[in-house]
Amino acid sequence: MLFSKPVQSSLSACLLAVASITGLAQIPTPASVLGHTPGDDFYLADYGDTIRYFHALAASSDRIKMFTVGKSTRGQDIEVAVISSAANLAKLDEYKKTAGRLARAEDLNDEQAKELVRSSKVIIHIDGGLHSDEVAGTQHTMTLAYNLLTAKNDPEIDSILDNVILVLWPTLNPDGQDMVVHWYRQNLGTKYEVSPLPYLYQEYVGHDNNRDGYMLNMKEEQVVTKTELEYSPVIFYCQHQTAPFPARIWIPPFSDPISSNISPYVRSWLNVVGTNMSAYLDAHNMPGAISESRFDNWYAGFTDWAGVFRNGISFFTETALYRYATPRFYTADEFPHNDQDLRALTMYTTPWEGGWWHLKDAVDYMVDGSMSVLDLAAKNRETLLYNRYQAARDNIAHFRKEPPFAYVISDKQADTPEAGLLAQKMIDNGIDVYATKAGFQANGVSYPAGSWVIPMDQPYSAMAKELFERQRYPDALENGTSKAIDLPYDVTGWTLPLQMGVDVDAVTDPLIADQRAMLTKVDTIKLPDATMEGAGAVFAISHKVNASFQLVNAALAQGGTVSLAQDPVKTAQGSETGAFLIGGITHAAVDSLTKKYSVSAVGVAAPAHTLALKKARIGLYRPWAPSIDEGWTRWILENYGFEPKSLYNADIRSANLKSRYDIIVLPDMSSRGLMSGFGVGIVPGQYVGGVGEDGIDHLREFVRDGGTLIAFNRTASSLIPLMSLPVANVLQGVKSDKFFCSGALLRVETDHAEMPANYGVSESPVVMFQAGPAFETLPGFHGAVLARYPKQTNPLESGLLLHPEAIEGKIAALELAYGKGRILLYGFKPQFRGQSHATYKYLFNELYSFDRPPLPAEAAASGKEKAEAMESKAAAKPAAQEDPDDDDIEE
């Protein structure tokens, strides 16, 4: 039997009262420490409150230990509570070591594994608060901990404490918990009580902290993954909100499709966990659980899903949410029409009938969801542990018989630091990486010493395969028609070598002993030593290397001079037009920078033709209706040494932008988000609106006076009517039965490689297309096409693209003259989620001030004539009127 029949309707409600009944005063109740019970109407505990309560528990019980596991983005300690019996906690290090051995399976046979299983405990990860506005998650962790620590003579909890070691995260996002709670407290009792937060609840990426599961760009995701690798939990359970209305909780099984790189043991037990949870909730009189509807887990980068590629049972649930801690009453006539009859379905067995929904209800559902997982783990401890071992054992065996037998990343590439970064990402995900000695060969190719090899006969190598291979999303067209069905929840292709511009070779023959003898395991990637050769007036560094931009910005900050070579010059990557030329600082200073950024330099004579670069004044639009794309852009620019200044609505609406900025970047957002933002009455007055017509007028003035305006993806499309540009978005108004691409990697061809905008970009880069535009020029266009999709060729490299003929031969990126200035439109995200490193240069190349060459002569009209023509037109409203929050999907 997988679940327990309770004697009371809600375990959490009963146990919160047990202290007063049984006199367990030594274990403090939440109310005794916080002055409130988690789940109380109109009350939310912030991170300080939460940690204070957990420390009070740890001071009064030998069943809990607190550990600091890292720092948040804003520098707060991230803490976890480890809960089990006192006897188990006394042997915690031993159990962690055993869990790791079973998870990796490398030094065990079946009998040894079975022997370890008999004496081992099953480690479970449960958390709350990854998405901070899904507030019940953080509140439920306190209740769950209290229940586990205060139970007396409870067979279910006694079994859990004896068999399970719970790694309980009070929150995965301390900074975000504080932001949301303090915002709610500030507005409590006003008409803005349930207002949305007007900024990202993670400093840079907000909701996308659950899209960073393999790239590990953010500190919080680095900490979570490091801790997962330390504890090797068999189950990784992440609590989210909100469920598809009117369901009260969404639980596994997931919708299809699912990756074939996931172990069958994991796939089947994901279903078991979900069906058991459904039965457990029913037994506890908790109606409204639904499965399959809406959520698939095709994308590998969900933080709460990436662990499946390490053979963990990793999943999430979505509990119903109104807004913060404010209750709401629902009647059945508010339900979608098909749900108003309250009819039971196969995956919605006990429909919710409506009524009041309090934060306490959400907390109770989460507590019982967590208890169902702990109860299941306690009753199936040996099976779960042995399955974890078998999954690793079988993965190792599979890749000893089937290709790819290894992946090789040469350390001699157009952008070697990017190659090293890709190898380091594998290490950070728990994958063993080896450096080669001289003479290593594979597939008949000799690789330089220091190249990196990932043998696939290791326990977590499914992660490498998932990230390196091209994704092929299952057919999403209805048989015999062009109609799209079963459309994906998130992006469908993410192949990292393509995104990062790194050559990775799959080894098609088994590794033999002589090859393995030439490999040395590395824990941290060491890049080849940067070199300085030659003598000359300036030092040339390659424009093909992303890290060169870090070096350039550091040199400018030190008072150096930087220019772009307009004639071919020698660099460490070969002869190159567009190379950076560094001068004005000492040889020692340049040498120090080359070592810091692993970028080699060559001393050369100053070429006859150069373009002098200057540090630009960069403005990055930061709307109050938050843009995740803005946050990613800000993070990337800061990491590369640029100094963007946030531009808010009031800044854009003010005149004389050119007196303060040289370049303005508009991140991806909906047209309504750009123009209108939050409506009146939704948020306090200072956060209302978007750039508005005044802002567009001032952006026109800014560019006309010589400024550079850069726009990504949907915003690029919005600017066409707003600024009367002689460009058309060929996908405007096109329905999914004629074209669909929610996120895939597409090949483009570079036009005008001689232009500074394309310096360092490969001839045929791969871009992340995510529901963006594709362009064609109209009469009067004066400018240049920077990249276009191939003609009569499907540009798809990885993921799902329906009806590629709609964009074949169309423009992906362009630059056009506007008065004295320029506008750059990118119909994709060149900085997608901090992953698409190969296209960063499309953005970076535009972030310096210099005297740019004139645009190509094929244009018919002069910039002045075109500007006058554009100014004579009224700025049209954008055709699309999306919701400003349409990026904020729940999972």
PLM-predicted stretches and their roles:
Residues M1-C14:
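Bacterial N-terminal signal peptides that target proteins for export
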Residues S12-A13, G23, R211:
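Cleavable N-terminal signal peptides
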Residues Q26-V135, Q139-V164, R211, N217, ...:
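Intrinsic-disorder/low-complexity accessory segments
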Residues A145-L148, N163-R185:
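Carboxylate/His-rich catalytic cores and anion/metal-binding grooves
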Residues T171-N173, Y184, Q239-P246, T715-A716:
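Short, solvent-exposed turn/loop segments enriched in Gly/Ser/Thr/Pro and often Arg
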Residues Q177-Q202, G206, Q222, K226:
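Active-site-proximal cap/loop segments of hydrolase catalytic domains
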Residues E228-T242:
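Proline-aspartate-enriched helix->loop->beta-strand connector
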